[in-house]
Amino acid sequence: MKILQPPSWAKPRGYSNGIAVKGGTTVYIAGQVGWKDGAWEAKDFAGQFRQALANILEALAQAKGKPEHIVRLTWYVVDRDAYLASLKAVGEAYRELMGKHYPTMTVVKVSALVESQARLEIEATAVVPDR
């Protein structure tokens, strides 16, 4: 995996501008919300973020993938202000689960999600190296 960072661009914080990968198995993980076994354990943005990311990592493990194999995360957030207010707690949860691996990321503000209690939904793409 090679991080793509054009020299004239400012270095991003908390994500990568691009990633190039050779070989491996590409894994696509559908949008995950912050529930566990179909039950909502958290109502706040940061709590739901933590669980959604944990769900992604649990699904990725089925392909023998690890956090560092994730190349893209797309977040769909219902409340931009809640997202911004939760950045510190989200960052702490992110580092706990992902370490210092920062894939490409996009955050999209949406008017609603199908699961009405969901504050966000995250989908992921990973490339698991051939063994």
Indicate residue ranges for each PLM-predicted region.
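N-terminal presequence-like segments and the immediate start of the first folded domain
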Residues: 1-71, 77-131
